[in-house]
Amino acid sequence: MREPTAHRKARILCALILFSVVSGCATESHQAVQVEHTASSAVPYRGARNAIAVGKFDNRSTYLRGLFSDGVDRLGGQAKTILVGHLQETGRFNVLERENMEENAREAKLSGKQQTLQGADFTITGDVVEFGRKETGDAQLFGILGEGKKQAAYSKVTLNVVNVLTSQVVYSASGAGEYALSNREVLGFGGTASYDSTLNGKVLDLAIREAVDNLVQGMENGSWSPRASR
């Protein structure tokens, strides 16, 4: 038995109205997020920039190094990228990039020019010595009145300044930080936070910024010099 035309039209109309309501609820937004910088980068510096190389940055914490880890040190790689940026932003160093040596050599060859690579007296190495995440939650009246959830990430890093000729560690600087995110739902209003993977990068950036500031402070108070004595 065929459905009456009037009923068919009514169903189509309802579907169109529902689609328009759903489409009207969909919103898109975007905004620029302020990038955090080291305190050292805000202090004017008129001295000479000294060449410094960045070596390995390893994850020495237990985070992402369990039995089922694939062996790729993503945390260390992320930390090294952050370190290079913050060192350069201080205005005290000419940071030497060693990750893309083959690519740079190929581009120089294609341009028909000879490379003039610069050496450094010191290499900065780094380690993520502590890293962890935790989630805590609470409920009011067994969750009837509301519940909350808090995510926290903690990181501690250590930077070592190594003399390239003697392999001596001439200076060390550390930094640590904690980031937290919390949401609360009360009587059905609000929402609890889902897992936020960006906390890893934020807390790592915070710890490295502090370590770089301590490194620069040590240089400026004479505890170490980016130029080896001749």
Model regions and ranges:
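Sec-dependent N-terminal signal peptides
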Residues: L13-F19
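A structural "domain/chain start" motif
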Residues: C25-V95, N100-K109, L181, L187-R230
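A short, surface-exposed beta-strand/turn
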Residues: A176-E178
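Soluble periplasmic/extracytoplasmic beta-strand elements of cell-envelope proteins
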Residues: A51-D58, I82-H86, N94-L96, D121-V129, ...
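Surface-exposed short loop/turn segments
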Residues: E103-V170, A180-S194
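Bacterial N-terminal signal peptides that target proteins for export
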Residues: R2-L13
